[in-house]
């Protein structure tokens, strides 16, 4: 499992893909539990991130360009959902 940092928050990815043309883009899966759902949702609402993938020596400013989840009701204790997220590089001076 690879480690990802979004805006200085460390996350453990269950799956990971990387592209570099025409812009850097990562796609990854997170297993989100009912206990971690709120914190992950608040983070993802930021939409624009400082992205770091230490194992790949990769760092860039990016925006979430795709998102899906396997389960929408994470309010039940013990529930786990697979979040699929894509983040694409943006201009370093861009801000949303």
Swiss-Prot record:
InterPro entries in UniProt: DUF3219, YkvR-like_sf
One Pfam family of this chain: DUF3219
Entry-linked SUPFAM superfamilies: YkvR-like
Gene3D superfamilies per the UniProt record, alphabetical: YkvR-like
Protein name as annotated: Uncharacterized protein YkvR
Gene name per UniProt: ykvR
């Amino acid at each position: 499992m690879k480690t990802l940092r979004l805006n200085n928050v460390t996350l453990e990815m269950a799956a990971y893909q990387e592209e570099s043309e025409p812009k850097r883009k990562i796609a990854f899966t997170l297993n989100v539990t009912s206990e971690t759902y709120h914190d992950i949702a608040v983070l993802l609402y930021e939409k624009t991130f400082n992205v770091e993938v230490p194992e790949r020596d990769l760092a860039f400013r990016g925006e979430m360009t795709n998102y899906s989840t396997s389960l929408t009701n994470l309010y039940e204790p013990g529930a786990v959902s697979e979040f699929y997220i894509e983040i694409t590089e943006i201009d370093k001076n861009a801000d949303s």
